[in-house]
Every structure is written in C-alpha cells, then in structure tokens.
Amino acid sequence: MSPMSGLRQQLKMLGTALLGKRATKSVKKKPFTEVEIKDLRTAFDLLDRNRDGRVTANELQFMLKNLGINVSDELIHDLIREASHSGNGLINEAEFLQWVGRIQALRDEQHSHEDSKDSKPVDEADDVTEDLIAAFRVFDRDGNGFITRDELQTAMEMIGEPLNEQQLEQLLVIADLDQDGRINYEEFTRLLL
C-alpha cells in the first residue's frame, strides 16, 4: 500500500468535519458507508494527537492551524461544545461521527438548495482543488510553498503513515520532479492524482 493512498480522502473527510457549516438544526442524515466510517475514524485519529480517545479544543485548533485555517479560541470552543454531548469539552469518536453526519447533511441540503436556485451542477473539480490545497497546507508546515524532507516526514507521521529513511527517499525521488530537494504544489498534485 502506498504511503499516500487514502490521504486525499482522509483530508477531504476531515475538511468536511472542520470546515462545514455549524450543524445546529435538525437535518435528515444519510447513513455512512463502511468506507466513510473507516475514513472518519482515521480523521478522528488525526485529531486525537495524544491518543486518549477524545478530541480537545487544543487538538482541533492544532489541526485547523495545519490546514492553514486560523480560528479564534472562542469558535474552537463553540465547535467542541456543539459536538460534545457530555458537555465536558471533549469529543469522543461516536460524537465526532454524529457531528460530521449533521454537517454533511447540511452541506447536502445547501447544495440541493443552490442547485435548484441556480440550476448549475456542483463543480467537483473545485472540490478536488480545495482538497489538494488543504492537503498541501498540512504538509507545508511553514507555509513557504514547498514541502521539505522534514515537513514530509513530520506530516506522514501526523497522519499515521511514518516513513523510514528509504521510503522517504523513494517518495522524494518520485515526487521531486525538478530535483531541487523539495516538493512544490504542482509536484504534490501530480503525486496524488
């Protein structure tokens, strides 16, 4: 299995969970497929940095920051409070799955409303581009537009796919087309697509 396999899907699911509209109203949810549940569990594991089975406000804020999204402490605490049924400021895996389900239902509802209003299909290419940019930001930790060897290694560890030196070197040889020792956005997208 390639170290990059599933990364885009994992980040897309995480992005849906973190960037969707706040899910406060009652909406009709579609049940998740087995693949979606697996991906959501992976996304939860990405958030749960200390592996205690719960996501804290700090863990959520850390991931958002790595996605290039700066949000206030107040918004982070609102998101956690909204998702946590126990009111303890922590989200367990079951609460996370329910929360994402509500967010997806809201997104589906919003897309269907926009489609009926504009009579335009949802442009999937825009979704892919947004996913790729979010994924690139996770890897490009210093935001300089390039993924260095160290950033690649750190990001792969963060998503639960640690690489040994040989695997890291192989990935860089494959991805670094201009052989400048770092991966730019174009090289990154070619690697994932």
Swiss-Prot record:
Any one of the GO CC terms: plasma membrane
UniProt domain EF-hand: residue ranges: 35-70, 71-106, 127-162, 163-193
GO biological process, one term: microtubule cytoskeleton organization
Protein residues bound to Ca(2+) 3: D176, D178, D180, R182, E187
CDD domains (UniProt xref): EFh
Record: residues binding Ca(2+) 1: D48, N50, D52, R54, E59
Lineage: superkingdom: Eukaryota
A GO MF label: enzyme regulator activity
Factors inducing expression: By ecdysone.
Listed Gene3D superfamilies: EF-hand
Binding site for Ca(2+) 2: D140, D142, N144, E151
Residue ranges that the Swiss-Prot or TrEMBL entry lists as coiled coil: none
Name of this chain's protein: Calcium-binding protein E63-1
Taxonomic source organism: Drosophila melanogaster
Higher taxonomy: Eukaryota, Metazoa, Ecdysozoa, Arthropoda, Hexapoda
